[in-house]
């Protein structure tokens, strides 16, 4: 296989936010488009093995949310919602001259992807929903809803100690200790630090206030009563040992989408696309 050709571009979001996106794989217009929606606090680490596979058959459009990666922050510092992400996704598609795409989402990217199929039905040709919820993820995080009650207190603490929290994240998150803590939520037998480190590195540099504002929106957002309106095929990937998105959430989502299909990753965690990429390759 030859070297990958990736071109870097920028779009302007609905409120003027500068948005980073990349095109790779097949020439635009010569193949279907696969659009990748990241999780919160992520800039694409989870697509390491899936993206090259897609590039063999598709034009891959990968972009960064506002306040993430190489994209800018919202001009007013406040507009960080799931719906804002969908509007930004539309702006990126417009800038790239992409009419319709097969939309992939991981973690919070599942919420963005599902909402995009409802807000932009003519732009979404299908969904691949990986290890994420269709709404209210903090109500099921680790099998309990207690984390949602903690969020306002965390937001208050970070707001009052912003620079201190930023310094802590910069010095602790992307360290051996940070990896040791993270291993408790992934399959340490199949996940190596090299694959996970880009996530820790990105998170360590992210503004915690931006992270929490988007997390607040994700916690309140749901499409639970609208899944039946999704008019495109959807492959829902659920991992048996996913503490962030319990497997039962994926089961319910797949059953509620008219053309939904469930793929089970036996023994997989929230980072199953990195732990067992061969299963996704066979399914896709």
Label each region the model flagged.
Residues 230, 236-238, 242:
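Short beta-strand/loop motif that positions the catalytic acidic residue
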Residues 265-281:
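Catalytic histidine-centered segment of alpha/beta-hydrolase-like enzymes
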Residues 52, 61-108, 282:
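Active-site loop/oxyanion-hole signature of alpha/beta-hydrolase fold enzymes
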Residues 138-143, 165-229:
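Conserved alpha/beta-hydrolase catalytic His-Asp/Glu region
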Residues 17-74, 78:
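Conserved HGGG/HGGXW glycine-rich cap/lid loop of the alpha/beta-hydrolase fold
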């Amino acid at each position: 296989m030859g070297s990958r050709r990736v071109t870097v571009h920028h779009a302007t979001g609905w409120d003027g936010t500068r948005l980073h996106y990349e095109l790779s794989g097949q020439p635009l217009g010569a193949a279907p488009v696969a659009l990748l929606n990241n999780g919160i606090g992520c800039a694409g680490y989870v697509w390491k093995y899936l993206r090259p596979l897609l590039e063999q058959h598709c034009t891959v459009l990968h972009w960064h949310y506002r306040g993430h990666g190489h994209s800018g922050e919202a001009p007013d510092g406040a507009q960080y919602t799931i719906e804002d992400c969908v509007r930004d996704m539309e702006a990126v598609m417009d800038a790239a001259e992409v009419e319709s795409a097969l939309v992939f989402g991981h973690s919070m990217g599942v919420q963005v992807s599902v909402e995009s199929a409802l807000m932009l039905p003519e732009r979404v040709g299908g969904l691949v929903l990986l290890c994420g919820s269709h709404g209210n993820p903090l109500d099921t995080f680790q099998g309990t809803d207690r984390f949602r009650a903690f969020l306002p207190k965390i937001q208050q603490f970070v707001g009052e100690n912003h620079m201190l929290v930023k310094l802590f994240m910069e010095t602790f998150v992307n360290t051996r200790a940070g990896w040791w803590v993270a291993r408790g939520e992934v399959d340490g037998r199949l996940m190596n630090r090299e694959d996970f480190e880009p996530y820790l590195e990105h998170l360590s540099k992210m503004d915690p206030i931006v992270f929490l504002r988007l997390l607040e929106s994700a916690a309140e957002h749901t499409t639970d009563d609208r899944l039946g309106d999704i008019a495109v095929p959807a492959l829902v990937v659920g991992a048996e040992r996913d503490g962030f998105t319990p497997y039962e959430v994926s089961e319910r989502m797949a059953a509620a989408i008219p053309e939904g299909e469930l793929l089970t990753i036996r023994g997989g965690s929230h980072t199953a696309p990195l732990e067992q990429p061969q299963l996704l390759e066979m399914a896709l």
